[in-house]
Amino acid sequence: MVLTVPMFLPTTAKEIEILGWDRPDIILITGDSYVDSPYVGISLIGKVLQNAGFRTAIIAQPHMDSDRDIARLGEPRLFWGISGGCVDSLVANYTASGKKRKTDDYTPGGLNNRRPDRALIQYANLVKRFFKNTVPIVLGGIEASLRRICHYDFWSDSIRRSILFDAKADFLVYGMGEKAVVELAEALRNGDPVHTIRGLCTISKEKITGFTEIPSFEEVRSDRHKLTEMFHTFYGNNDPLTAKGLFQKQDSRYLVQNPPQPYLTTEELDAVHDLVYARALHPYYRQFGDVKALDTIQFSIPTHRGCYGECSFCAISVHQGRTVRWRSEKSILQEAIRIVEMPEFKGTITDAGGPTGNMYGFECERKLKKGSCPDRRCLYPKICPNLKINHSPLIRLLKKLRGIKGVKRLFTASGIRYDLILSDKNNGRLYLKELVNFHVSGQLKIAPEHTEEPVLRLMGKPGSPSLLQFKKEFDALSKKSGKNQFLTYYLMAAHPGCTENHMRSLKRFTREKLKTTPRQVQIFTPTPSTYASLMYYTERNPLTGEKIFIEKSFRGREAQKNLVMQKEK
């Protein structure tokens, strides 16, 4: 069954009444406003649950000072599902320099005044304050996923327990949770056991037979070598084909992480995205102002999930996985047609992509059968020969999307891996030609992040020769096509191992080789469950044990950024 009505999930008592419900089965709570879009996790999960037959409602950004929001729909029959939003609430609320962010792209009106710090903990406490002895509280989303085991927390500069313990919740769904959350809802409805559901974290009083024990909270809090040992085991048990269940002692009880759910197949991904999304802000929240994020995602199409880039500072590997999965052409084209039929659509599809724009349609055959390699990366230090890069499926898809009546422009806004383009000897240049001629809005995003080899090695990023070769070919094709187009370079300051001298060299490179003054320079933020955050806390390369320089002062971190961004006198 494909969901067609209602287009929005209910968020008010009036909507519940119109639907004829006595109460919802499930109430989802989120730190973002309710934008009904396949790009917004809480919306997608809500639609999947509703399509599975569960009466699902959403409460977005509830007020924390009373029950006026949290109690307006009553108590759900099965469970409360809580997400901090599309990004970790502390990342959303604070800059890398510890300053409070004034604006928020997911809050109506744009002011950052509706999402509490540590939103999962705050919302769980809010539920328990007004609903005593309530139904289970289930955590999900990126904040839950990355904080599911003991982790380094940059904002308190400390090792924290699993968010499942700190929020005093009942269950935690990690990763892309469509399968796990439906299985959990069915089990709770039927009174069946839940503790074997894949993709679920639970709490146990006992050790779990057959699962792997990782160093305890007390051990990793007092011993940085134990933290490194813990993270290696955690990171190595994220692939559904090879992962074992894990458990970790936290105080007198144990966190239990079941093995991950199998990745969605193409058919399953299609089914999720073939559900109808309003691609708009719910009218109840629209009265409080516009949501800026909608400008980016309203007319964009997600084509694939996962990333095998494995950049040290990126959390996608732990949340979405290292195996890329993609939707069928048919499903993507049907979504484009639905977008064209929207009254607000003016002819421009702002993006068709995924975490990395040009990973659609090909994967390592060995990985698909046996799982990710435990001892090597797909792209670093060089591209693995087992990965047969082939841009032809993406070229074909883009051509078909351009051919849809009503589509005037189709842009690639997702960042691309230029090393993949250069390594695809058969179709890489054809793809680049397609990009230059049809899919660049004036600037094409690429993320070299740095140019200095010691820093790139710790990041897991390709070297500068491939960057210069790509720039040369992009500029030549743009000139040939008569288009005034540029590359936008995303760069990073203060990554573990990066010194001011490295940033001076980066500045010199951008001036002399790239002929630009960078405008997109971010300061590294140690987010939970990444290798770069492990480096930041331990001050060592986790793969070699080598001691590395870490810039930890806010002043020094800002200085690194300013070295690159300052204009020449």
Show where each model-derived region lies.
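Flexible glycine/acidic-rich beta-alpha junction loops that bind and position SAM and/or redox cofactors
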Residues: D88-S97, L146-R148, E178-E183, T323, ...
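Conserved, mostly hydrophobic/aromatic
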Residues: D170, V272, C307, I332, ...
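N-terminal [4Fe-4S]-dependent radical SAM core
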Residues: V2-R23, S33, T228-S300
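Conserved SAM/AdoMet-binding glycine-rich loop
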Residues: L28-T30, L44, I59, H63-M64, ...
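Terminal amphipathic helices with adjacent charged low-complexity linkers/tails
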Residues: D65, V194-L227, F231-N238, Q261-L264, ...
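N-terminal pre-triad scaffold of radical SAM enzymes
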Residues: I29-V35, R286-A315, L333, V340, ...
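Glycine-rich beta-alpha loop elements in corrinoid/cobalamin-binding modules
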Residues: G41, A60-Q250, Q257-N258, P262, ...
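Nucleic acid-processing catalytic cores of prokaryotic defense/repair systems
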Residues: P24-T30, S37-G74
